[in-house]
C-alpha cells in the first residue's frame, strides 16, 4: 500500500484565510510543510473585478479587499513557499491575475 502513496499530492487549502497578512500566510505555509503537504494553495482575485452582489452591502466586499493578493503579495508568498520547500498553487478568478501569476 505505501508504494502507491507517492502518487498522491497533499494540498493545504490556505485560500484567503491569511486575510492579506503575509506573516500569517508564512505561518500557514510552514505548518502546511510540517504537516507533510506538497502544495500550499491560495486564491487570487481583484475586488474591482468582482460582480455586484449582496457582498456590496453586508461588509463582505471590505473583507475581500483586505484578503486580496496583489502582485507584490503574491510574489512574497511564492518566495516564502520556495524558502520553506513547498510548491505554490493558486486559484485565479480572472484573466488579469493570470498575467502576473504566470510570470512569477
Located regions from the model:
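N-terminal amphipathic alpha-helix/helix-capping segment at the start of soluble metabolic enzymes
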Residues: 1-15
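Hydrophobic faces of well-ordered beta-strands that scaffold small-molecule active sites
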Residues: 10-14, 40-42, 88-91
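Conserved, mostly hydrophobic/aromatic
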Residues: 13, 32, 101
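Active-site beta-loop-alpha junctions enriched in small/polar residues
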Residues: 15-17, 43-47, 93-95
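Glycine-rich anion/phosphate-binding loops
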Residues: 17-31, 71-72
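Glycine-rich, proline-tolerant flexible connector loops at the mouths of alpha/beta enzymes
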Residues: 38-69
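Active-site beta->alpha loop and helix N-cap motifs at the rims of alpha/beta catalytic domains
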Residues: 58-104
Amino acid at each position: 500500500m505505501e508504494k502507491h502513496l507517492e502518487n498522491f499530492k497533499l494540498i493545504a487549502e490556505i485560500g484567503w484565510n491569511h486575510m492579506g497578512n503575509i506573516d500569517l500566510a508564512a505561518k500557514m505555509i510552514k505548518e502546511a510543510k510540517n504537516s507533510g503537504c506538497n502544495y500550499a494553495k491560495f486564491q487570487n482575485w481583484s475586488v474591482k473585478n468582482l460582480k455586484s452582489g449582496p457582498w456590496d452591502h453586508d461588509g463582505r466586499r471590505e473583507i475581500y479587499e483586505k484578503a486580496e493578493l496583489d502582485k507584490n503579495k503574491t510574489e512574497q508568498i511564492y518566495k516564502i513557499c520556495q524558502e520553506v520547500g513547498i510548491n505554490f498553487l493558486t486559484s485565479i478568478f480572472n484573466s488579469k491575475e493570470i498575467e502576473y501569476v504566470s510570470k512569477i
